[in-house]
């Protein structure tokens, strides 16, 4: 009896040691939005001004859109205060939202951007940037706006795509109009300002570097054209394009009230 029981126990132990799941692969670790980015292949642009289509990338990083909406963290509030927001601005910080999302850079790499918009438009705006990511529309840089200085220089060379910035609306000569810009409410976005410049009624631009983009028949990365997905996607959420203005044109500018 003892020998038989011992033999049976040995068989059970052998079976337990040899049995295994169908796969021994360790589970894929969860990746945070700040994981290392994937680098996509580069090449000539398409006729729509989009970056080249990539081969599937399965290494580190994300090849599909990822974005999130949050209240403005204290660290970002400190970064904004006395630069792009201050007491007396027409919208309170608690009425703004921080968007974090990945976007396609001009060299085909996937980057992580930050943008502050009004809470009421946050979900719609994030949806637009998801469409643009899927269509491979590239951005030079997406980040929080820089400080506005009255009569100071406007830097378009970095071509930063940005939204909220508490400042007045500007006349063609860059002097304040006395009313708030829609950027002050988080209800306006400037996209690739160098590639999509503000053009005065006399055809001049604010920076010599933008003159290379005055010919809007060109189809260069990051440029916005009539009927393009960028224009249609913003129109679908009720935002208007400055390229539709009569006289002056603000090709970079999208806003809820068309100002």
Question: What do the predicted segments below correspond to?
Answer:
Residues 1-7:
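Bacterial N-terminal signal peptides that target proteins for export
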Residues 8-16:
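Bacterial N-terminal signal peptides
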Residues 17-78:
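N-terminal low-complexity, Pro/Thr-rich disordered segments
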Residues 54-104, 109-114, 181:
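Compositionally biased intrinsically disordered regions enriched in Thr/Gly
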Residues 58, 174-259:
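Catalytic cores and adjacent binding grooves of peptidoglycan-active enzymes
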Residues 91-157:
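Active-site acidic/histidine clusters and adjacent loop/turn architecture
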Residues 104, 127-138, 167, 194-197, ...:
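Structured segments of extracytoplasmic/periplasmic soluble domains
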Residues 136-140, 155-193:
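Mid-length scaffold segments of soluble, non-membrane domains
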